[in-house]
UniProtKB/Swiss-Prot annotation:
The gene is BAM9. GO terms for biological process: polysaccharide catabolic process. Pfam families: Glyco_hydro_14 (PF01373). This is Inactive beta-amylase 9. GO terms for cellular component: cytoplasm. GO terms for molecular function: beta-amylase activity. It is found in: Cytoplasm.
Length: 536
């Protein structure tokens, strides 16, 4: 086997007389390919960049670096600032990398993609691990085979792995909560978040049942602890060497929030309060009685807008509206306190379960920037982020992260105010700055992510955020691999982005002769070689 590439100076030589295998990038029904049947192209034919030639077999993932002077525009970059030198770049694997049947999806494409990312200088890969896949059939019955297979591939390629433990479901991938949990939910729907219309959110358990034995006699926290301990045992050989970080799912989509924008509601709306399952209502009733206001414990605000309605469509979020009243402070303080307590419980469980392994723990917050310019911050309130009486909710949450020695992941670092619609009164830059400042005050290390959909000027905005000297960001995860990621236009932009974060200066020891380069490109062009990857 022989792999010839232009790029990573750390690549080393491995040759063997093995049959070549065609590689393609297929994600779902999409195929990214070049002109000929044995070529995979990441850019159009007018590209000025030197192509990356890859020959490989199923029995090896090692590679050989071949460099020519013509490749210098790709390999060399201007000196980067000190703030970028310590940033590690990761890329997220597809959410459905492992199916709900524990099979690894699009294995060949992912393996080839990992090699390409390694050659670009990417540090590692983020792997979403779903509770509903691993503990699918019965409580305490764990099946890690699919995820272990991915970890082994990542290790062989020479990348690092960041594991995201997801205690939520995903409609996008049709991966739900474990089957045995869903059966309990069918009999006892009160375990799910519920809105005022009685609609349930079945991709995450209600925060109000955290310490209630609703799962075959166990509490969700006890079940999560068992999951974490099983993960630690199953992946013991990878801890600290291949696995260099673990993220704990804190709510819907893995983020610390209420599912306030569920049921395909438009993000332009204010969202809905999720406090109508029986356990939330019971907690609200008890809190109201303890404060001497029993009538306030009958339900959520009656004058709040619906999911996709603008905040000014009713009086609750208006200036001088109910949110500023004594009742509003009572309800919002209670609602947000449950969110904060949930974060503390999950992170405490994880901190205890993973004690002593030397791998950093992380949790993720949402960037709820819609309507942030309004005094009431409606999208943040319905999701559980309420600040009042001198207490900043983000700072309170950062304090909990610090208490549990946990790092905070903040998404949306590719977003700018400039590209938001004026009608939404959105300000991702302001909110992001506020959260980062809260983390700095509490000594919490920040990691970054981009939003799920590419936006204009996104890569440039990410670089600006990573250069922020006030809040050091140690790791950035770009979301997410797939057909769009490897499309010519996007992969070109991603390559330039990586170049801006890394220096690709090679020593003379790493360089190969022009004859070797010509031999490689000639074999590709003749059609007798292996598939090629072109990058721009």
């Amino acid at each position: 086997m022989e792999v010839s590439v232009i790029g990573n100076p750390q690549a080393r030589i491995c040759r063997a007389e093995l049959a070549y295998r065609e590689l393609g990038f297929r994600f779902g029904s999409d195929v990214i390919s070049g002109e000929s049947r044995n070529r995979v192209s990441f850019c159009n034919q007018s590209s000025k960049w030197k192509e990356i030639a890859i020959r490989c077999s199923s029995r090896s993932v090692k590679c050989e670096a071949i460099v020519s002077d013509d490749a210098s525009p790709f390999l060399k970059s201007t000196p980067k600032s000190k703030s970028l030198e310590s940033v590690k770049l990761f890329v997220g694997l597809p959410l459905d990398t492992v199916s709900d049947c524990n099979n690894v999806n699009h294995l060949k494409a992912i393996t080839a993609g990992l090699k390409a990312l390694k050659l670009l200088g990417v540090e590692g890969i983020e792997l979403p691990i779903f509770w509903g896949v691993v503990e699918k059939e019965a409580a305490g019955k764990y099946e890690w085979s699919g995820y272990l297979a991915v970890a082994e591939i990542v290790k062989k390629v020479g990348l690092k792995l960041h594991a995201s433990l997801s205690f939520h479901g995903s409609k996008q991938t049709e991966i739900g909560l474990p089957d045995w949990v869903a059966k309990i939910g069918d009999a006892e729907p009160g375990i799910y978040f519920t809105d005022r219309y009685g609609q349930q959110y079945k991709d995450c358990l209600s925060f109000a049942v955290d310490d209630v034995p609703v799962l075959d006699g166990k509490t969700p926290m006890e079940v999560y602890r068992g999951f974490c301990e099983s993960f630690k045992s199953a992946f013991a050989d990878y801890m600290g060497n291949t696995i260099t970080g673990i993220t704990l799912g804190l709510g819907p989509d893995g983020e610390l929030k209420y599912p306030s924008h569920q049921h395909n509601a438009k993000l332009s709306g204010a969202g809905e309060f999720q406090c109508y399952d029986k356990h939330m209502l019971s907690a609200l009733k008890g809190y109201a009685e303890s404060t001497g206001n029993p009538l306030w414990g009958l339900g959520g605000p009656h004058d709040a807008p619906a999911y996709d309605q603008q905040p000014n469509s009713s009086s609750f979020f208006s200036d001088g509206g109910s949110w500023e009243s004594q009742y509003g402070d009572f309800f919002l303080s209670w609602y947000s306190s449950l969110l904060t307590s949930h974060a503390d419980r999950v992170l405490s469980v994880a901190s205890s379960a993973f004690s002593g392994i030397g791998v950093p723990l992380c949790g993720k917050l949402p960037l709820l920037h819609q309507w942030h310019k309004l005094r009431s911050h409606p999208s943040e309130l319905t999701a559980g982020f309420y600040s009042s009486n001198g207490q900043d909710r983000y700072e309170a949450i950062a304090e909990i992260f610090a208490k549990n020695s946990c790092r905070m992941i903040i998404p949306g670092m590719d977003l700018s105010d400039e590209h938001q619609s004026p009608e939404s009164l959105s300000s991702p830059e302001s909110l992001l700055g506020h959260i980062k400042t809260s983390c700095k005050k509490q000594g919490v290390v920040v990691s970054g992510q981009n939003s799920s959909t590419p936006v204009p000027g996104g890569f440039e905005r990410i670089v600006e955020n990573l250069k922020d000297e006030n809040v050091g960001i140690d790791l950035f995860t770009y979301q997410r691999m797939g057909a769009l990621f490897f499309s010519p236009e996007h992969f070109h932009a991603f390559t330039v982005f990586v170049r801006n974060l890394s220096q690709f200066e090679l020593s003379s020891d790493d360089q190969a002769s022009e004859a070797e380069v010509e031999a490689e490109t000639a074999s590709i062009g003749s059609g007798t070689g292996a598939p090629s990857l072109q990058t721009a």
